[in-house]
């Protein structure tokens, strides 16, 4: 990663989106960038601006670069990011197709990586929830939690519990929704993620799980 990209990421994490974009564009253009971290940052910056065409371009070039280099690690990341752009646009069906494509790659190259599977299963569950497929959403979200609990990644665990809470709340199984939302809050607190805690509390208010 170049110093420019490194510094641009710092700006982005500090919430200085405009500064991050201005710095990145001094040296790179999304149409020609051949740096994974740069393309990834372009995608985040364009999503922030709701410039989805450019965000899609950044992620598509990321996947193309990974495939050209036969880099399975970067390819699965690129597919996941591409799905996130479609998710941000509300195109849950296309996002799910890409997450399923990522799952096939994981099965081939990362079959024992519990964290990667947890993240993929979470998206499969979340997207199916958005598509109204509650039964399959629950299946994948439970699997996400199972995989997350085999790691020491508290954020993955917190996200899976939160996802289960949303599915149970949507299904009006309020006791299980409250239990899983509270477990999510506990995991986010252990990870010192105050934003994550607040997001779950907001969900509980939205679903009237109080």
What are these regions (language model features)?
Residues 6, 41, 74, 81, ...:
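"A position-specific structural signal for the A-helix of alpha-solenoid helical repeats
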Residues 33, 73, 113-115, 155, ...:
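Residue signature of alpha-solenoid helical repeat architecture, marking inter-repeat boundaries
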Residues 21, 25-29, 63-67, 100-110, ...:
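Amphipathic alpha-helical segments of tetratricopeptide repeats
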